[in-house]
Amino acid sequence: MTTSQLHIAFLAFPFGTHATPLLTLVQKISPFLPSSTIFSFFNTSSSNSSIFSKVPNQENIKIYNVWDGVKEGNDTPFGLEAIKLFIQSTLLISKITEEAEEETGVKFSCIFSDAFLWCFLVKLPKKMNAPGVAYWTGGSCSLAVHLYTDLIRSNKETSLKIPGFSSTLSINDIPPEVTAEDLEGPMSSMLYNMALNLHKADAVVLNSFQELDRDPLINKDLQKNLQKVFNIGPLVLQSSRKLDESGCIQWLDKQKEKSVVYLSFGTVTTLPPNEIGSIAEALETKKTPFIWSLRNNGVKNLPKGFLERTKEFGKIVSWAPQLEILAHKSVGVFVTHCGWNSILEGISFGVPMICRPFFGDQKLNSRMVESVWEIGLQIEGGIFTKSGIISALDTFFNEEKGKILRENVEGLKEKALEAVNQMMEVQQKISRF
């Protein structure tokens, strides 16, 4: 079996939007490697089908389907049950990586793993005699919080001081997997054990850029606790090849500059019916032009007659081309769940945000948007109400503060562009592992 040809493994966490950033990483580092390099991408069949349908053919990527833990004939589980079954099947990943080496006849040169999986795969790089790199798809702040899970869990106060943070954090800002009383749950257990083992990775790469780390202590602390740390972002995800069948861009072309509200809450979040109603009432009252990405199961919770009454200034679609929408000059504000990918996309296109976080690192991300980067607002009271949405929209479209927030995000957009231009050197370093 040869070692002269490069062969790099990428091991994906198949839930949420984790797998797509890992594929984006492949696309970003591949230009710096010989054209003969083999990229082996390990992921569940359903996730592979989804992410590879959105990108052009990748001839240099070999796709391997790993078992999702669901026995043949059983119903497909959702949520935590699906994660639990997949975690139980991760022991088989070692076997399929060995099979990939046998199939290609080329030993692995490096193993990239989603950081979520690191606790299950920590021994794999040594077994395969290759360096191991963990990919944290979020920002440095959320990673820093996970590394101090034990300290946070021992805290009995509503605010706490975490090494690396110059200011205190509210316990409400902390991801619930960190503060969970039961560390035996699939997510909390996985992330806790990840934090305990991440220092064993030869490097940790983050989908972030230095200018987002307003607190330099965070990066210093990460460098102290981990072997090597690289910011490689913003890796804005590839635009989907799916056609804009709903005509969002054509509709935006007819709107005034920075006048449109774009609402989207990711592929996982389901808005409570009462909050859907509150959003609808606020949009109808304000008559602000809007595009709302709302799946069909949410449309049924709209007020009766809403679609007809707002058809002259609003558009509701079951799927929206988010990158193209955020890049459009007519979009003035982004109402978001504060998933990390959405935040990076908002920053990269200079669109300020109204934040309604739901789970994971979203509350911490939301705090960063409002209090640290000052490029958006958290919704009043933490949930959508008619008055809270109207107040937030008034801030962006009628008040001086909205102008300041817009200027701040434009400044970060420029920093993001600079980071992209400077990222060649970092990507070259990563490609040499």
Curated annotation (Swiss-Prot):
What GO molecular function annotations does the UniProt record carry, in alphabetical order? Answer: anthocyanidin 3-O-glucosyltransferase activity; quercetin 3-O-glucosyltransferase activity; quercetin 7-O-glucosyltransferase activity
**Which Enzyme Commission numbers does its entry carry?**
2.4.1.115
Q: Does the keyword Electron transport apply?
A: no
**What's the protein name?**
Anthocyanidin 3-O-glucosyltransferase
EC class, as a word, reads transferase
TM regions (residue ranges): none
Chain sites annotated for binding an anthocyanidin: 18, 146, 360
Q: Which reaction does it catalyse?
A: an anthocyanidin + UDP-alpha-D-glucose + H(+) = an anthocyanidin 3-O-beta-D-glucoside + UDP
List, from the UniProt record, the residues annotated as the active site of this protein: 18, 114
Any idea what job this protein has?
In the presence of other necessary color factors, this glycosylation reaction allows the accumulation of anthocyanin pigments.
A biological process (GO) of this protein is: anthocyanin-containing compound biosynthetic process
Which amino acid positions bind UDP-alpha-D-glucose, per UniProt?
137, 320, 322, 337, 340-342, 345, 361-362
Which pathway features in its UniProt record? Pigment biosynthesis; anthocyanin biosynthesis
Query: Organism's domain of life?
Result: Eukaryota
One Pfam family of this chain: UDPGT
Gene of this entry = GT
Tell me which PANTHER family the record gives: GLUCOSYL/GLUCURONOSYL TRANSFERASES, UDP-GLYCOSYLTRANSFERASE 74E1-RELATED
**What protein family is recorded?**
Belongs to the UDP-glycosyltransferase family.
* PROSITE patterns the UniProt entry points to: UDPGT
Could you list this entry's UniProt keywords, alphabetically sorted: Glycosyltransferase, Transferase
